[in-house]
């Protein structure tokens, strides 16, 4: 049976309140939304202009947060997928958002870039106080930054659990997931 459910974000429940809250939420898609022919700065200038943000203040701040302040001077266009991913995260941070939503943040990256992106996500949480909602199939990396997990299968919420409980019940997040899926299929 369908259940439309409800959403509450930063204390807001109505459509109007939720619409106003969108400025506090940044989204990082699984494939880059950056204009490949433009530099990181040019991409961010476009977003600042669209969203009415002070580019002179925001761009240096977000580039520094994601470690692109040096990289952006190297090229007039964005070629490397790791740089695109950092730029996508910088874009999501524009306006000093409180909640970041990631869809497969390390999708398509090589092992070193994967490690780097997950380290960045953890640092943004610890040092900047950003709340993260992360959709990922990379359970080992996810376990390194998560404080709690929500398990969804075929559109159905299976379980929500803290990482402390998960660590008490299984040697790894992957093993916890295996056990959960085995129980569901019975």
Label each PLM-derived region with a short phrase:
Residues 2-13, 20-21:
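Conserved ABC transporter NBD signature motif
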Residues 45, 56-71:
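Conserved ABC ATPase "signature" region
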Residues 89:
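Hydrophobic anchor residue at the start of the ABC signature
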Residues 100-103:
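Catalytic Walker B motif of ABC-type/P-loop ATPase nucleotide-binding domains
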Residues 115-127:
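Helical segment within the ABC ATPase nucleotide-binding domain
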